[in-house]
């Protein structure tokens, strides 16, 4: 091998050498093939390679694939081919096994209620080695779908669930690090039915002892959830004074709202009994006849 320190050579110095001779020249040599005259076809430029063994990446430190580095030109290769014409150099980044994304294992179910603001979830909090991977971006994984009414913005999950999932729903998120590595995290959401908004009153200003409960009418006042309210008390008739009646509300949207019960108080007036007394006056007339 002719080292790179040799900068000139006699043009006919190899003319009488064996035809099978290979003239090896360092890859960084300044000598051109023409400098060897008729022996130029025997010249092969070669790298002087040093092997680096493969090393697995950890959650805190990058690893590398098996690769070779030329001692002379400092280029990197993924094979031990030394021929300059056939060896393909790669960027050093191609030899690196980047740090994998480490995400926490989600074991807790996330409980929400239909139509109510959920507690904001910062999905970045699930990444255990964000600094080592240079930060991550988050998106809903391919093939997975977000819950209706929820939004993902900048890695933060928020919103009002717009559909009940009493048996739960899994949503998978993909975390992508700046180094290109990815990891998935699946969260299990439980969305419970909401209690409807109900304000019940009994129709009518006055009620009397003995009024039949079955004839009382309930009215919904205020901003109520759509549905039907009915009295379900076993009381047949109102008693004098306060009567606590139980009602049941059945929402129209029974898929997303619970059936609820409550009570309403009805005041009943005492029945007034009027007694009429009749007085009879008898007049007796006495006639006196004088005696003669």
Q: How should these model regions be labeled?
A:
Residues 27, 69-85, 173-181, 247-260:
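Enriched for extracellular/lumenal, surface-exposed ectodomains of secreted and cell-surface proteins
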Residues 41-101:
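Thrombospondin type-1
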Residues 270-292:
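Ser/Thr/Gly/Pro-rich low-complexity, disordered linker/stalk segments of secreted
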Residues 181-192, 260-269:
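C-terminal edge beta-strand
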Residues 1-8, 18-32, 44-45, 58-59:
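Structural signature of tandem-repeat unit edges
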